[in-house]
Amino acid sequence: MDTNLFNPAKRNRSDKNIRLTYVGRVAIEKNIKEFLNVKGDYKKTVVGDGPELKKYTNKYPEIEFVGLKMGEELAKYYADADVFVFPSKTDTLGNVILESLASGTPVAAYPVTGPKDILTESRINTLDNSLEISIQKALKVKREDCRYFALQLTWEGCTEQYLSLSLIHI
């Protein structure tokens, strides 16, 4: 992941709404309907395209559907979110989780393969069988903890960890 692109410095919001964001294909297999049906006083944004986009745009007019975004524009959506919601129960690895963490945005997700393999540190682990409870946990996570964790997962971060472990054993 590009930690220069996905960076908390891109955050530029003045509103006080709690913003939940989903990034990915708008498709049934992504379990996005669980995100769309989350109860609470949230502003929800869906970033992405897919076969269910038109249907969900019509069914959920209160939700902001912005379509496919890339590069700087995508990075801004991650940084501006208060919580990134990853509702999938079938993805094995979500790059979007890493991009969100690099942006300093905590992740709400189910405790399934993928999220549970990435969100291993207790300070950022918000996993729960209830997406709504996971969101509440994520709202308590410090953004700097997300960023710090993501920096450990870059090639540079992994190399530093490897070298520090190697030096211990010399």
Segments the model singles out, each with a brief description of its role:
Residues 168-170:
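Conserved small/polar residues in nucleotide/adenosyl-binding loops
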